[in-house]
Amino acid sequence: MKVRAEGLMNGSPLFYARKILETIFTILLAFYLQYQTYYLPSAILMGVAWQQLGWLIHEFAHHQLFKNRYYNDLASYFVGNFLQGFSSGGWKEQHNVHHAATNVVGRDGDLDLVPFYATVAEHLNNYSQDSWIMILFRWQHVHWAFMLPFLRLSWLLQSIIFVSQMPTHYYDYYRKTAIYEQVGLTLHWTWSLAQLYFLPDWSTRIMFFFVSHLVGGFLLAHVVTFNHYSVEKFALSSNIMSNYACLQIMTTRNMRPGRLIDWLWGGLNYQIEHHLFPTMPRHNLNTVMPLVKQFAAENGLPYMVDDYFTGFWLEIQQFRNIADVAAKLTKKIA
């Protein structure tokens, strides 16, 4: 295979060492600003660090650097559980299915946002037409953007729940690795709460907590929602399920690349390439992009790439389409 022959599946230890040191330096700089009483800039910088750590746990959990999966797992516990507060195993539990069945209704857990949002019309069937939830659905395209900053808080809570249940998980692997994840999360909250403790008063602590987590949440969410929510969803019975490449290309939208975007988005602006080659390291996605474009053109497949505002508007339109259906259903009983 050409991508393997050109070494595009090989991760660079120097690249990942630099990225880890870069995020640790960002955290230390946030500590320093806090020490100098620049509390708001410190909180914002912590949010940036947590976003960047999100890309690193994503990459190590995809086994992009080491050939030995055990070393990738250890790295994911460090950048994920300890530094970030996210469960490595919990991430794999949902994300691996997302890759195998991207935007497939009833399989891709990323589509399951009920009761707050309906990503497909089928979700409306689960609620009565006079339910208050249907009112939320009617206006979901309006309040969607306001919920993006809360993504990190949601993932933190999900991580705590998942890790607490790991010792009794039905997968033997999770039972064996539960202690690593539990220690990692415990240490994360130890240093994270200690950081808040050294702030001068409760009002500053509350400000710091919410600013750092909401900034980190928005920086994560504006990326991870762009790629798939703006495109079509498919039924499990669809013929596209028999062609992995078609499924990934037709359910994914890229963000236009650039130096700043490549850094800010952690390489996920090359989401089509990432979905076709999940274990390909971030620093090679730009190189493989022309090959993927050529493959799409030769096979009559769309290669969707847009600027952020175009993609975000298409994302909003997808939610509005479902909102319109919800509005019609509720009007029938008005």
Which stretches of residues belong to each language-model region?
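Membrane-embedded catalytic scaffold of the fatty acid hydroxylase/desaturase
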Residues: M46-Y170, S237-A326
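C-terminal, active-site-flanking charged/polar segments
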Residues: S212-T225, Y229-S230, K293-E298, P302
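Juxtamembrane transmembrane-helix termini
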Residues: I161-T168, F198-D201, S230
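C-terminal regulatory/interaction regions
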Residues: N299, L329-A334
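Residue-level signal for inorganic ion chemistry
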Residues: K2, H228, H274
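Short acidic alpha-helical/loop segments enriched in Asp/Glu that coordinate divalent cations
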Residues: Y229-S238
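Membrane-proximal N-terminal segments immediately preceding the first transmembrane helix
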Residues: M1-G7
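Alpha-helical bilayer-embedded segments of polytopic membrane proteins, i.e.
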Residues: G11-L53, G80-G85, R138-L153, D172-V224
